[in-house]
Regions:
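Basic/aromatic-enriched alpha-helical hairpins
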Residues: 1-61
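Hydrophobic (often cysteine-bearing) scaffold residues that line and stabilize catalytic clefts
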Residues: 20, 24-27, 46, 67, ...
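N-terminal DNA-binding recognition helix of tyrosine site-specific recombinases/integrases
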Residues: 30, 34, 40-48, 59-94, ...
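Conserved hydrophobic/aromatic "anchor" residues
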Residues: 53, 78-79, 191
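Glycine- and acidic
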Residues: 55-64, 165-170
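Conserved helix-loop functional segments at active or binding sites
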Residues: 56-59, 84, 117-124, 156, ...
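Basic, Lys/Arg- and aromatic-enriched nucleic-acid-binding interface segment
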Residues: 65, 69, 90-147, 151
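Conserved tyrosine-mediated DNA breakage-rejoining catalytic core shared by Y-recombinases
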Residues: 96-97, 152-192
């Protein structure tokens, strides 16, 4: 299992975001640590083993429902890929018998006072902290653009005449075009070369 999983991760490395690759890798590492060996065959990963692992995630590691769900889903994805590539038969897929809790997550957002405090925070000119703050603020003021999309943005994505960004959004795979406000424009102008 682990040999296949590592090879599969290397194959998809260039087709997924870095954060997805890291998440998958860390979940495989965590499962390998739980198993205590790299020599695990697909048929050894049973419903009982997965339920024990799920209990270990929650009870021993203190992982919440969302993290437990991610851990099991990553393993299931590796199984599905192995089935698709005819490495194992469909009958070996134990995940359909596993129950995963879905808990509603509370997403926390900064309020206007917190955003203003961050924007007005005195930082040393020319240091990386200032650039990271500007990137974060740009993500807020550019219509909530995901930080990962901000990082890979290029100046060519910006239409200066119309104050619009035309960007391929990594998560959805779609191209979005949207107008940005003065704060975002000022940040772009600050770094224009």
């Amino acid at each position: 299992f682990f040999e296949y999983a590592r090879k599969r991760l290397e194959k998809i490395k260039s087709t997924v975001s870095y954060s997805t690759y890291r998440a998958y890798t860390s979940q495989i590492d965590k499962f390998e640590k739980y198993m205590g060996t790299k020599d695990v065959y697909f048929d050894e990963i049973t419903v009982a083993l997965l339920n024990d692992y799920k209990f270990h995630l929650g009870d021993t590691l203190g992982n919440g429902d969302t993290t437990q769900r991610l851990s099991i889903i990553v393993l299931g994805t590796i199984f599905r890929d192995a089935i698709r590539e005819e490495v194992i038969p469909e009958t070996m897929f134990p995940f359909s018998k596993i129950t995963l809790k879905i808990s509603s997550s509370k997403r926390l957002f900064l309020n206007k006072v917190q955003i203003d405090a961050l924007a007005n925070l005195k930082l040393i000119e020319g240091k990386k902290a200032m650039m990271w703050r500007d990137l974060f603020l740009f993500s807020i003021y550019a219509g909530g653009l995901r930080f990962s999309d901000v990082i890979e943005m290029q100046y060519s994505n910006y239409n200066e005449a119309e104050h619009k960004i035309n960007k391929h959004i990594r998560k959805t795979g779609r191209v979005h075009q949207f107008k940005i406000g003065k704060v975002a424009i000022d940040i772009l102008e600050k770094y224009k070369k």
